[in-house]
Amino acid sequence: MNNLKKKKNPSARELAVTVICTVTQQGKSLTEALTLADVLEPRDKAFCREICYGTIRWYSRLEGLLNLLLKKPFKAKDSDIKVLILTGLYQIIYLSTPDHAAVSETVSTCSAGRKSWAKGVLNGVLRNFLRNRATLEKSIDAQLNQQFSHPTWLIQQLQKDWGDQLSHILQANNQHPPMSIRVNEKAISRHQYVKQLDEAAIKTHENPFNSVGLTLDQAVNVDQLPGFWQGTCSVQDSAAQLAASLMKVEDNQRILDVCAAPGGKTAHLLESTNDSNALTAIDIDELRNQRVIENLTRLNLKADVLTVDALETAEWFDQQPFQRILLDAPCSATGVIRRHPDIKLLRQASDIKALVELQSQLLEAIWPLLEKGGRLLYATCSILSAENSQQIANFVSRHTDAQPVTIDAQWGQACEFGRQILPGQDNMDGFFYACLTKT
């Protein structure tokens, strides 16, 4: 229970504790929980976000250090005090704040609530850490799961799937991701937009794998992007920008985007094709589908957006086959941990089996909707082979009319079926793509 937030105008750190407790105790996503910080002024909100993302990113390591510093664990009702200490440890270890200031700020936060009794505990624990920091960190880093702050089950699975690339993956997952954008080529060329960005003092470099992607040297608010609200560009990781070209859409084709929300790939498909194509975007979540509609409206694009269950094709399929299908399958999201560090806390090993089964069901349901000679692109933001190459291998073994298409590319690495990008490769998120044609 969080008793720290007792003032009408809580501080950034008080709200950070509330946000983190919302994730760790209620199981809400960090993105959702961070809406609590919208009441803060921009500068305080930025600090709150940094504390939240950083503490969640390094939660297991920080918790391990705290356990070494405590004689006995905190009671459940005092979990907010535990989290407050973790934020202090994060600030000391990973931010440039002077040690004495980090300790003082953390302890003073305790005075804001009903648990002023804990001030002495906080002060003692943090100062004890400062005295014994080298020894404590050496001890905790002897264990891989705490050194890199990843759950043991995930480390074991990544070791099995990727072997000697494990260390690279774990390190990449803890890096701050870049901000990438996709220029809407129906509105402006990348070359022209770069000029506008230069005039706005926003420095970028071009995505080498397509003609519309840019990565910003430093993240900015979308309000600072020239013409953003008029549809000049969208925020989208470089890996997700690869889908449109892999679809190889031709004129006068019917396109189906399955699990389309929030619509980034939907919009890119429409931006990169002409108006002779008809695109249907489906998703089971009505609220998320509203995001699709909002994005398409901002970009001045049109599609048939349906809130339906992709598995129940009899309820929405009009019996007119599609020439192109994109299945952006629900997955473990293990490729985007650097953007969503709460995945390390919220995702469980038991989730993977259920996700693999759902992906298989979606493939089985959607495959009959593809016209003979048509192309299906299977995509995930996972780096687990069970959801990716093995999933496609199993599907192909069951369907003699499914022909794998080799993806000839300069990005990622080839798998038996499909192509995998690991986190951080070419500054991209972890992503998997596999192409199938129907014979």
What is each residue range found by the language model?
Residues M1-T439:
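S-adenosylmethionine
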